[in-house]
Amino acid sequence: MDLQTSIKSYKNNVASKYEFLDASNLEQIGNQKYFCSKKIDGQTFFLSVQNDNIQILNSSSQDFSINLQHIVEQVKNLKIKENIILVGELFDNSKKRERNGDVIVALTSKSSNLAIALFDIVKQENISNSFLEKYEKLKKLFGDDNTKPIFALSQ
């Protein structure tokens, strides 16, 4: 799995199509099935697990694993056996309201208050076809307990 290519492809083909929805434009979805989650105001980060190598990168593919060892250790404890790249929002879990600027400050201080709320699978060995299958896999791997440093964002 080429990590940089996967991140770039996700940003160009998936993230660029994210849409903000509120009550005023919800009708545009119509009767289509859709998934939505709380918007966390942090920074988009990618989690890569490849052959027991765990990396946490920002959307520019800069590796912040050394600053986020508390998350890396939690992922190691999960003993994930497949190569997989996930995406989520990195945020300061100690604040009542998430703010992008808090992430920048916390990264420089290697704060253990940072958490990552995973919301999608970028690439995996065992392919899940639908988003629902991907979400179920996220929940199975990481749970949805938002008090932990890493969790699947509830839909």
Task: Enumerate the predicted regions with their spans.
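Covalent nucleotidyltransferase
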Residues: 27-147
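A sequence-composition feature that detects small, non-aromatic residues
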Residues: 15, 23, 106, 115-117, ...
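Charged, flexible boundary elements
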Residues: 2-36
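Compositionally biased, low-structure terminal segments
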Residues: 11, 19-21, 65, 92, ...
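N-terminal cationic leader/targeting segments used for protein routing and processing
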Residues: 12-14, 101, 149
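Acidic carboxylate-rich catalytic motifs and surrounding loops in phosphoryl-/glycosyl-chemistry enzymes
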Residues: 148-155
